[in-house]
UniProtKB/Swiss-Prot annotation:
It comes from Shewanella denitrificans (strain OS217 / ATCC BAA-1090 / DSM 15013). GO terms for cellular component: periplasmic space. Keywords: Cell cycle, Cell division, Periplasm, Signal. Belongs to the TolB family. The Tol-Pal system is composed of five core proteins: the inner membrane proteins TolA, TolQ and TolR, the periplasmic protein TolB and the outer membrane protein Pal. They form a network linking the inner and outer membranes and the peptidoglycan layer. Residues 1-21 form the signal peptide. InterPro entries: 6-blade_b-propeller_TolB-like, PD40, Tol-Pal_TolB, TolB_N. GO terms for biological process: cell division; protein import. It is found in: Periplasm. Its main location: periplasm. It holds the Pfam family TolB_N. Part of the Tol-Pal system, which plays a role in outer membrane invagination during cell division and is important for maintaining outer membrane integrity. This is Tol-Pal system protein TolB.
Length: 442
């Protein structure tokens, strides 16, 4: 039970974020290695000032992706252009970037706006410029025109970022996703807040406020529900809550531990940790019927289950080998296999969306870091350089990991790219935040 106590202590350490303000994202490493891209401020074709500059949102998204580095707009050779017809390829000859994003915004009826954007292949443009005048339309990698309402500027900015990211990398963008996390503001009557926000910290929404701890939020595959652990009734219970209707369902309230929920790929079941029969073991609960099926059966602690993408197996953390390590269990055969061997401890594993890697917490020399292991080669790479890292959650496109950590004595969220090169911190004002969970594609 000492090991479980340490795990629970680690889980309760991470509590950081503001309720009334967006989480900022401060990039700490990896900018120099990113791919340069030019984003020209979108042209406003209306009276006064534009309601919001969409290009700022696109620049922020691409910067936070860890893949791209938007150039300083002051260094761009052209401004006030919105289409390839105005693009002077010769002027861009010495600009070290692979593509240019440009566009325009103009009023289009009451509280509506017509947004146009184009993605230009700058490498090809520079090559063609050496050959003399060419047909500029061949340089357009993508072009879109959309009518949006006044409250959709941020959303459509993220949509443009998704399109640009996928066009240039072949990987689906994740800028329209959200994160869930638990905020604690000590001194309040109900200090524990279950929150969701856009991936970049904007548009925060409180789902639940409680005088007792809330823990371990996790998203359903359709992005409509969250499962989480609540102590509001003075004991651990697992609830599932619809984020749109706010309807809550009590799924598990057995004696002892009810913890670590994880949705199955079809959204119909939860893998959980229960101690109703003695030691903490892994169970699978049918959400509709509440029936619980025991999966592991060992005298050691088994906890932190998560699903393989095919829904046929689970990962879980167990000390059955003497120290916490990650194991897998096949749901049909019950066969258990050890997955991790390097490091002192390995905890909280989850399989990446492509099924090729596992993200987890690795303890080596007494330090907790986020790590990645290639499931085919078993190569282990420590990704983070922060301390007391916990609760890693992978973006649905598999490119980034968000997790909890500490910075200057305060518990914060952080992010790291899947190759470990790009790192960012999400500082907040008052309060603490823990247990980040990245949504699926929405």
């Amino acid at each position: 039970m000492k090991i479980l106590a340490k795990w629970l202590t680690l889980a309760t350490l991470m509590l950081t974020a503001q309720v009334n303000a967006a989480l900022d994202i401060v990039i700490t490493e990896g900018v120099d290695a990113a791919r340069p891209i030019a984003v020209v401020p979108f042209v406003w074709e209306g009276p006064g000032a534009a309601p919001q500059q969409i290009s700022d949102i696109v620049m922020g998204d691409l910067s936070r992706s860890g893949t791209f580095k938007p150039l300083d707009i002051r260094a761009l050779p052209q401004h006030g252009i919105s289409s390839v017809a105005q693009f002077a390829a010769a002027s861009w000859g010495k600009v070290g970037a692979e593509a240019v994003v440009m566009g325009s915004i103009k009023p289009y009826g009451v509280d509506q706006f017509l947004v146009n954007f184009e993605l230009i292949d700058l490498v090809r443009a520079q090559s063609q410029a050496l050959k003399g005048p060419q047909n500029n339309t061949e340089l357009v990698l993508e072009s879109r025109q959309t009518v949006i309402s006044a409250n959709q500027f941020r959303q459509y900015g993220h949509r443009i970022s998704d399109i640009v990211y996928e066009k240039l990398t072949g990987i689906r963008g994740a800028f329209l996703t959200r994160t869930a996390y638990v905020v604690v503001k000590q001194g309040q009557k109900a200090p524990y807040h279950l929150m969701i926000a856009d991936y970049d910290g904007y548009n925060e929404q409180m789902l639940l406020r409680s005088p007792e701890p809330l823990m371990s939020p996790t998203w359903s595959p359709d992005g409509r529900r969250l499962a989480y652990v609540s102590f509001e009734n003075r004991k651990a219970e697992i609830f599932v809550q619809d984020i749109y209707s706010q309807t809550r369902t009590l799924v598990s309230s057995y004696p002892g531990i009810n913890g670590a929920p994880s949705f199955s790929p079809d959204g119909k079941k939860l893998a959980v940790t229960l101690s109703k029969d003695g030691q903490p073991e892994v169970y699978v609960i049918d959400i509709a019927t509440k029936a619980a099926k025991r999966i592991t059966d060992h005298y050691s602690i088994d906890t932190e289950p998560s699903w393989y993408p095919d829904g046929k197996s689970l990962l879980f953390t167990s000390e059955r080998g003497g120290k916490p390590q990650i194991y897998s269990v096949h749901l049909d055969t019950g066969k258990v296999s050890r997955v991790t061997f390097e490091g002192e401890w390995n905890l909280g594993g989850s399989i990446t969306p492509d099924g090729r890697s596992m993200i987890f917490v690795n303890r080596t020399n007494g330090k907790f870091h986020i790590a990645r292991m290639d499931l085919a080669t078993r190569f282990l790479q420590v990704l983070s350089s922060t301390q007391l890292d916990e609760s890693p959650s992978v973006a649905p496109n598999g490119t980034m990991v968000i997790y909890g950590t500490t910075h200057q004595g305060k518990q914060v969220l952080a992010a790291v790219s899947m190759d470990g090169r790009f790192k960012a911190r999400l500082p907040v004002g008052q309060g603490e935040v823990k247990s980040p969970a990245w949504s699926p594609f929405l």
